[in-house]
Amino acid sequence: MTLDVSDSKATDLVLTVKKYMTAYSLSCLYSFRRCPYAMRARLGLLFAELPVELREITLKNKPAHMLAISPKGTVPVLQIADGVVIEESREIMEWALEQQDPQELMNPKTLHQGNTLIEQNDQEFKHWLDRYKYTDRHLEMTQTEYRKKGEAFLQILEELLTKNTYLLGDSVTIADIGIMPFVRQFAHVDRDVFYSLPYPKLQIWLKNWLAHPLFIQAMTKFQPWQDGDEPVIFPS
């Protein structure tokens, strides 16, 4: 029997089969939309123009497969098509951009400085950011005191941005996408306070990022994944 693919149902079936076959050959990213670590992983994949199967999770109901491949239970988690699992957002960014880097985010001229900034973000700024955002869990200092501690890093970024459009020059680097989600989170604790601080260049940089087409794409909303769902290819 010959299948007439002009029939709409048959065409839909063919497209669905093709989508499943495509997803099977792709890496799989477990993600949570609002997590800054997951944001930068998605940005890395977008700038690398590297499609993956995306599985959005809920923190209260983590998929069994995700926990099986990454028992630590935090996102993002990327399982490469060959089965290798990458559990850290920074490593996911780097892996994606090592596959292809059309905009040279990992330019050797700025890579060392970019890595140093990301390290400072992850080890120092994130510490104060968590306490600023969740002051009720960290009562040793006031929220204002925690904010001022975090501002030490913002001052470094402001100084860099007085010279350049982006952190390390006039083009995007891995430092920008690796740090921006955390500055966004800091700003969102109290937007009025953030935009009253003496960091005009940083504020413009953040506003530009929030309007950036790839960031908007990175923040696309997806329904939480369940076993048996039709694959979601990201970017679609």
Which residues does each PLM region occupy?
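Short alpha-helix boundary/capping motifs
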Residues: 73-74, 185-189, 196, 230-234
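GST-like fold's C-terminal all-alpha helical module
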Residues: 117, 121-211
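Acidic carboxylate-rich catalytic motifs and surrounding loops in phosphoryl-/glycosyl-chemistry enzymes
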Residues: 57, 218-224
